[in-house]
Amino acid sequence: MERVLLSALGGQRTSSQTPRPPMDLADLDARALYLQVNAIERSTSKNYATGARDYINFCILHSLPLDPTPTTLSRYVAFSSQFIASAPKYLTGVRHFLKDLYPEFDDNRSHPLVKSTIRGSKKVRADPVHRKLPLRLAHLQSFVDVAECTGSFDDLLMAVLLSCAFYGCHRMGELIQKNDQSLSDWRKIIKRASVCFENTRIQYRLPYHKSDPFYRGTDVIFTMQDVANPVALLRKYVSWRDRLHGAKSALFLREDGSNPSRSWFDLKFFAILDRRYGGHSPRTGYATFLASLGVSESIIQAVGRWSSDAWKIYIRENPAIRVEQQLAAIRLQH
């Protein structure tokens, strides 16, 4: 049958490329498994594993079969929600690892018994949502002032990171590395070679972000600003960095040559600001800043590289942005 079909399609020719030799089926299966494992980020897989382990431990503790029936899932949520607010989210990890073993998982997860237990757990816990405050221009200037006062390379790096995070609307995870080195991915690191200088602007290539899962890359462009000017700061930093680290590939490096980590960032960040602010504050701050200028939501969404659904959730749950937009609209009317 296969040869008949090939003949009807014009023979075995597939392209002008060199013919591809067959692979051993075991090697193909191993390759397929490798690709499946890499379908999600390692950090996501680690979080999923946490949820799956929690569910398995629950079943062992209560002498229940692993089969995720509606009753078992309901019991799991009822038990876990006493201790953690993320119990319903853990079911995503359970699904990831057990779906192949139990194909009916989605139907059971959507069962009215499970849905009502999840809804009840959220209402009973009623955990408040704590949003980090947006960073303001005065905060950025504070970090620049520290760098100018100390003359420290690492303090300059910190000021540069925050300026880039703010004006580039970055997630901090795009500029700094996780503390867990096993989760670091060289492909995501911004490279020194991608930096391009022009008269009044500078740009680099962001190789990956959440809305770009296939590493197509995005050019992040900075223009001159009155406060914590990213163009001037990056020029100064890159000149100093090149003298220290020469041809090392990563753009953002500490004085000792290591990548800036989350713990390093937190130490510097919270030396000046309190816990009402966080790593997401620069991104929130720039969105708020743009809104205060009357920039439309669609432009803010594009600048921040948000997916549509994520942006709708983001702007709805950050009233500061709505306030700034309303004030900007009033100013434009007058």
List each language-model region with its residue ranges:
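Extended, non-catalytic subsegments within catalytic or DNA/protein-binding/adaptor domains
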Residues: M1-H334
